[in-house]
C-alpha cells in the first residue's frame, strides 16, 4: 500500500470521467447477495453520454454529477406508499426515510432497477421500495465488515455525496476520494495517488463511472447507491436509493456507517446530523 490509513482526498475539479472501453464482467463470487446483472443490453459501464442512446432507459440532465436536485423534491409526504409490507422491520422508522426523500427516484427507470421500484407516482416519479433500501444497507454492512478498514474506498463526485462519503470513511476507517476521480488511481502504479483497495463504494455509477471502470479493471467488487435511472451491470451490490438528494445521501451513509461498525462489534456513536452536508 502507498497511502496512509483513513485518508481523505478531495479533488475540486468536477469534470465527468467518461467510460468508453468495452465492458468487463465483474466476479461476484465474493458476496452471496451480489447483484451483477447479465442482461446483454446493459453490458457497458454507465455514463451520461452512453445513456442518451440506451434502449432500456431515457436519461436526462439530472444524471450530471453537478446537477443536484433541490431539497423540495424530498417533501414530507410521511404517509406515502413506499413498500409492499407496511409492517416491515426497518433500521429507522419509515417516516425518517420519507422525510429524507430516500424513496424518491427519477422520472426514468432502467430494466436493471425495475425490481427495486415499488410504484410510479402521479407526477411521473418512480418510488423506490424503502424496505429493499433498508435490507441492502444491512447486506452492504455485512459485506464491508469482512474487509480491513484501510482496504475500503468510498467515492463521490456528486456535490451532496462528498461530505457524507468522507464522514463515512472517517467513521469506519476507510479511504475517500471525492470530487473528480483521477484516472489511474486504481490502475497506474506510477501515479502519486495510486492505491490498492479491496472494495469500492460509489455514490452514483454514472458520476463515479471512472472509479467503477477501474474497479472492474483490477477485479475488485463495487457497492453502488443506485437510483431508478441507473444501470447496474458493473455493480456487485446495489443499494437502491435517491442518490442525488442531500438528506437522502446523508441518511444512507449514516446508516451504512453505523451498521458496519455494529457488525465489527464497535460502538456506533454517530448522529445523523453529523453526516448532513450543508446547502
UniProtKB/Swiss-Prot annotation:
One of its GO biological process terms is:
translation
Q: Which InterPro entries match?
A: Ribosomal_uS2, Ribosomal_uS2_arc, Ribosomal_uS2_CS, Ribosomal_uS2_euk/arc, Ribosomal_uS2_flav_dom_sf
Q: What keywords does the record list, in alphabetical order?
A: Ribonucleoprotein, Ribosomal protein
Tell me which family the UniProt entry assigns to this protein: Belongs to the universal ribosomal protein uS2 family.
Task: List the cysteine pairs that form cystine.
Answer: none
Q: Which GO terms describe its molecular function?
A: structural constituent of ribosome
Q: Please give the GO cellular component terms listed in this UniProt entry.
A: small ribosomal subunit
Q: Where is this region: Disordered?
A: 1-81
* Name of the coding gene: rps2
- Feature: compositional bias, Acidic residues: 1-18, 28-42, 65-81
The keyword Ligase is annotated on this UniProt entry? no
Q: Which HAMAP family match?
A: Ribosomal_uS2_A
Q: Which Pfam families match?
A: Ribosomal_S2
Tell me the protein's name. Small ribosomal subunit protein uS2
Q: Which SUPFAM superfamilies match?
A: Ribosomal protein S2 (SSF52313)
Amino acid at each position: 500500500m502507498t497511502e496512509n490509513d483513513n485518508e481523505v482526498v478531495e479533488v475540486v475539479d468536477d469534470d465527468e470521467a467518461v467510460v468508453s472501453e468495452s465492458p468487463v464482467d465483474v466476479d461476484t463470487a465474493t458476496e452471496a447477495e451480489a447483484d451483477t446483472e447479465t442482461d446483454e443490453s446493459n453490458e457497458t459501464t454507465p455514463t451520461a453520454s452512453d445513456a442518451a442512446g440506451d434502449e432500456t432507459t431515457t436519461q436526462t440532465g439530472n444524471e450530471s454529477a453537478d446537477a443536484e436536485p433541490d431539497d423540495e423534491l424530498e417533501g414530507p409526504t410521511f404517509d406515502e406508499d413506499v413498500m409492499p409490507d407496511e409492517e416491515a422491520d426497518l433500521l429507522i422508522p419509515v417516516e425518517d426515510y420519507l422525510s429524507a426523500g430516500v424513496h424518491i427516484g427519477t422520472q426514468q427507470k432502467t430494466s436493471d432497477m425495475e425490481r427495486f421500484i415499488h410504484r410510479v407516482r402521479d407526477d411521473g416519479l418512480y418510488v423506490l421500495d424503502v424496505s429493499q433500501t433498508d435490507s441492502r444497507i444491512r447486506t452492504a454492512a455485512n459485506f464491508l465488515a469482512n474487509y480491513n478498514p484501510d482496504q475500503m474506498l468510498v467515492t463521490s463526485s456528486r456535490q451532496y455525496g462528498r461530505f457524507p462519503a468522507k464522514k463515512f470513511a472517517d467513521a469506519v476507517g476507510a479511504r475517500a476520494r471525492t470530487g473528480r476521480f483521477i484516472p489511474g488511481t486504481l490502475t497506474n502504479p506510477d501515479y502519486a495517488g495510486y492505491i490498492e483497495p479491496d472494495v469500492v463504494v460509489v455514490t452514483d455509477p454514472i458520476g463515479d463511472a471512472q472509479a467503477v471502470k477501474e474497479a472492474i479493471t483490477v477485479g475488485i467488487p463495487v457497492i453502488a447507491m443506485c437510483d431508478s435511472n441507473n444501470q447496474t451491470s458493473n455493480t456487485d451490490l446495489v443499494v437502491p436509493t435517491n442518490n442525488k438528494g442531500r438528506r437522502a445521501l446523508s441518511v444512507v451513509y449514516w446508516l451504512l456507517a453505523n451498521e458496519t461498525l455494529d457488525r465489527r462489534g464497535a460502538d456506533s456513536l454517530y448522529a445523523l446530523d453529523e453526516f448532513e452536508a450543508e446547502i
